[in-house]
Amino acid sequence: MHACAHHGAQSPQQRGSPAARRALADPRVRHFDLSGFELGCGRLLPVGASLAYKVHGPPIGQGAGIVLHPTSFDAVHNELEYQIGPGQTLDTARYTVIVPNLLGNGVSYSPSLIDPAAGLPPLFSVRDNVRAQRALLEHLGVGCSKEAPLDLVYGYSMGALQAYEWAVAWPESVRRIAAVCGAARCGELNRVFLGSIEAALKADAAWDAAAGRFTRPPTRGLAAFGSIYAGWGVGSSWYTEAEYARAGFASAEDFVERSYLPAFANCDADDLLSQIRTWRDADVAVHTGGDLRAALGRVRARVLLMPCDQDRYFTLGEAEREAALLGDRCVFRPIVSAAGHRAGDPHRPELGAEATWIRRHVYELLAE
């Protein structure tokens, strides 16, 4: 496996979301070759499969610390840049920040980047993603060893699932993780949420159950997907206390219509399903026969847990239980916000307080 500078060479017929296409066109994105990479299910990735990534800050090997920032659900690397840079949450005055794209997100190897006739990719597990990231870092000369561990793995949502996987699978390879609005595994309530948005997509006539893919963009299915997501992605008081007005929306209906529906309207549905499968499968306890206590007992990193008190699927209660299992290895700093899950991705102007809270505690973690 090796790095290559091509853009989208793994696709004879690119579809993908507009965001993914913009990310692929980024002149600084690079692709690490995953040809022949063995997935956990035993399947080998085909020739041309790659892990897309971008490096920010000082060149690797010049003495700066290393931060890994994996992407989250339906996010691509350039959408995370609002918190990367000098003086930002991930400060490139002090750290080199490496952002790998999730397999299935339309930038790394994904359904939208292959000919559907070739067959859609199987499950990309969180473990598969982290193993690919480790191979990338080793190629880049980042040791990920007990002698030279990563300074931080920072992850929001599905990125937090990956951060936890790093800490459990390779306890000596990372000094710290920050898990923002995420968890060590996908819980039962979370699975119910994922099942509902998956069912919304597949209810569209464009879904070909026999082939296991969409024959055309499922316009109605994507609208239903966005409508359901709007009930889960923010906290209950976002609606009951009309917090949406702070963000410039006239009503709850206006918020859904102008925020959630367009957010998913042009997504590639096959890529969404791939990422849903990755998310639903996530569980660090796979390393310990299903025992979460034992899995978290493997963690040697300092762990910053930042759930949102109103997150409706990565819940505060689950984070509290994980914090208790981690004990004094954990710094527990909940975000108090009506924005719910969105609070952990504070790129919107109305989330300035949430952004400041996250930055403050990441800085404190890195100072330890």
How would you label these PLM feature ranges?
Residues 54-114:
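N-terminal cap/lid subdomain of alpha/beta-hydrolase-fold enzymes
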Residues 88-135, 190-191, 195-202, 339-340:
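Cap/lid segment of the alpha/beta-hydrolase catalytic domain
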Residues 127-151:
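Conserved acidic catalytic loop of the alpha/beta-hydrolase fold
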Residues 173-174, 179-262:
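Alpha/beta-hydrolase-fold enzymes
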Residues 282, 309-314:
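Acidic catalytic loop of the alpha/beta-hydrolase fold
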Residues 288-292, 301, 312-325:
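Short alpha-helix in the alpha/beta-hydrolase fold that links the catalytic acid
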Residues 299, 305-307:
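Short beta-strand/loop motif that positions the catalytic acidic residue
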Residues 329-368:
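Catalytic active-site module of serine/aspartate enzymes centered on a nucleophile-bearing elbow/loop
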